[in-house]
Amino acid sequence: MRDPIETVMNLVPMVVEQTNRGERAYDIFSRLLKERIIFVNGPVEDGMSMLVCAQLLFLEAENPKKEINMYINSPGGVVTSGMAIYDTMQFIRPPVSTLCMGQAASMGSLLLTAGATGHRYALLNARIMVHQPSGGFQGQASDIERHAQDIIKMKRRLNEIYVKHTGRDYDTIERTLDRDHFMTAQEALEFGLIDKVVEARDVSADESK
């Protein structure tokens, strides 16, 4: 059976640009990377996380002061993979603007709210979902106990991150994340996960640059 990701990548359009050396072709994502646009699309896992972190580090090396734009449409995924992206976002010098299109669930919502203050957006019909981490393990009783302790520590750490970026108190975050909690873009704004709901691009801001 063909890998669905491979199938999608084979359908990625190419963009042809004219340069003083002739024509140059880029896949659409590479071309957008030149504009400092990164996509977090699909499940968050190690391979995707590595690529996103590499792009963040590359754009920092290219210009340590210019804003990076991260577009998110993700159902979430592996916590450690998401934390690698989160830590890299906090580590690099350029501010990272985040925008949710479609959905930002689980780790996707954490990456959304981790954007630079004042630069966290969601499109009008985006859906945001927050919850506590989940996992399963089989083995000896003592090993299961250790894994349970570890996931509880991870839950506390994730709660602390949401507290930091939303301004909500710890108890509110813990209650909200106790079960799957779905929000509209407006509800995410009111909760403090984002700073603005956007329906159309601000043309006046682009023209003033």
From Swiss-Prot:
Q: Where in the cell is it found?
A: Cytoplasm
SUPFAM superfamilies for this protein: ClpP/crotonase
Q: Which reaction does it catalyse?
A: Hydrolysis of proteins to small peptides in the presence of ATP and magnesium. alpha-casein is the usual test substrate. In the absence of ATP, only oligopeptides shorter than five residues are hydrolyzed (such as succinyl-Leu-Tyr-|-NHMec, and Leu-Tyr-Leu-|-Tyr-Trp, in which cleavage of the -Tyr-|-Leu- and -Tyr-|-Trp bonds also occurs)
Record-linked InterPro entries: ClpP (IPR001907), ClpP/crotonase-like_dom_sf (IPR029045), ClpP/TepA (IPR023562), ClpP_Ser_AS (IPR018215)
What are the BP-aspect GO terms?
A: protein quality control for misfolded or incompletely synthesized proteins
A GO term from the CC aspect: cytoplasm
Indicate the family of this protein.
Belongs to the peptidase S14 family.
Report the function annotation for this chain: Cleaves peptides in various proteins in a process that requires ATP hydrolysis. Has a chymotrypsin-like activity. Plays a major role in the degradation of misfolded proteins.
Descriptive protein name: ATP-dependent Clp protease proteolytic subunit
Which taxonomic lineage is given here? Bacteria, Pseudomonadati, Pseudomonadota, Alphaproteobacteria, Hyphomicrobiales
